[in-house]
């Protein structure tokens, strides 16, 4: 009996440190009791390393958050431990609760697809209209090289030869066009387009010349002979010299183009 009396009182003495530590308030003891330390060592293999308590942990994490040691499975304790951790640290998101993000390869393909596909074909910056025949559905794939026409810069020697040819032939034939293309280092298309533009310019110049020929100012200009025919003969002091009509006193014999007066005509008749 003495042995039993000595054995049973030792049990509350062993449990007293844990009970004493639990009965205290929110004060933090940097050196936890042995029972908590042993429980922490057993839970270290299953708990998250970010959640494990060590002497350098923040002071707001109290030793009462460590779940008690029991014979139940470890998984419920882990979930309970994570719950307390999220409750005291809301700024640190749990890896399981994070939103899923696409991989780098998937995001790269999406950006590439958005860059190459256009909702409307006229959004393409080009001067040609080749997309009208290529666009069959709602999506249009951009070409690698823009189909832009560049203006051909002709040299002075090329322009001189082309002008000479145009002076003789307004419409160039196919064999002559091939010869000029080889001689001037141009394509047949360049020569054909140049002759088309040159003919349009020549027609405009011809229209301007015809317009000048039918100008009313030029129609009013008549020759001196027409003026002499239309002008009535003046009696007395009128003298006609070319296009100018000059007024003069009585005619004298020194003037070659003398208009005789009425008195002189009567004297001539009497004689």
UniProtKB/Swiss-Prot annotation:
Residue numbers covered by motif Antp-type hexapeptide: 119-124
Residue ranges, compositional bias (Polar residues): 249-261
Keyword Nucleus applies: yes
InterPro entries hit by this protein: HD, HD_metazoa, Homeobox_antennapedia, Homeobox_CS, Homeodomain-like_sf
Keyword Nucleus annotated: yes
DNA-binding residues (ranges): 147-206
Region span, Disordered: 204-271
Signal peptide: none
Keyword terms, alphabetized: Developmental protein, DNA-binding, Homeobox, Nucleus
CDD domains in UniProt: homeodomain
Gene Ontology terms: cellular component: nucleus
Tissues with expression: In embryos, expressed in the anteroposterior band of the endoderm, with expression continuing in cells of the pancreatic anlagen and duodenum.
A UniProt-annotated Pfam family: Homeodomain
Top-level taxon of origin: Eukaryota
Known function: Acts together with ptf1a to induce the pancreatic lineage within the endoderm.
Family according to the record: Belongs to the Antp homeobox family. IPF1/XlHbox-8 subfamily.
Protein name (record): Pancreas/duodenum homeobox protein 1
Taxonomic lineage from the root: Eukaryota, Metazoa, Chordata, Craniata, Vertebrata
């Amino acid at each position: 009996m003495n042995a039993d009396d000595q054995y049973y009182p030792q049990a509350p003495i062993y449990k007293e440190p844990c009970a004493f530590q639990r009965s205290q308030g929110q004060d933090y003891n940097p050196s936890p009791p042995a029972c908590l330390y042993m429980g922490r060592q057993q839970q270290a293999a299953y708990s998250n390393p970010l959640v494990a308590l060590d002497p350098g942990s923040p002071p707001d994490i109290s030793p009462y958050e460590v779940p008690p040691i029991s014979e139940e499975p470890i998984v419920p304790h882990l979930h309970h431990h994570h719950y307390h951790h999220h409750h005291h640290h809301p700024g640190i998101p749990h890896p399981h609760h994070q939103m899923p993000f696409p991989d780098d390869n998937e995001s790269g393909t999406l950006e590439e697809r958005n860059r190459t596909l256009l909702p409307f074909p006229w959004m393409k910056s080009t001067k040609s209209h080749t997309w009208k025949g290529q666009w069959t559905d709602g999506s249009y794939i951009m070409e690698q090289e823009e189909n832009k026409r560049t203006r051909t810069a002709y040299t002075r020697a090329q322009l001189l030869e082309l002008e000479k040819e145009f002076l003789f032939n307004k419409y160039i034939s196919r064999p002559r066009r091939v010869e000029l293309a080889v001689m001037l280092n141009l394509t047949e298309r360049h020569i054909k387009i140049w002759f088309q533009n040159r003919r349009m310019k020549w027609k405009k110049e011809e229209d301007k010349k015809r317009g000048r020929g039918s100008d009313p100012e030029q129609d009013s200009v008549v020759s001196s002979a027409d003026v002499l025919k239309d002008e009535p003969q003046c009696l007395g002091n009128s003298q006609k010299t070319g296009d100018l009509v000059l007024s003069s006193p009585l005619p004298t014999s020194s003037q070659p183009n003398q208009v005789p007066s009425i008195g002189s005509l009567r004297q001539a008749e009497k004689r």
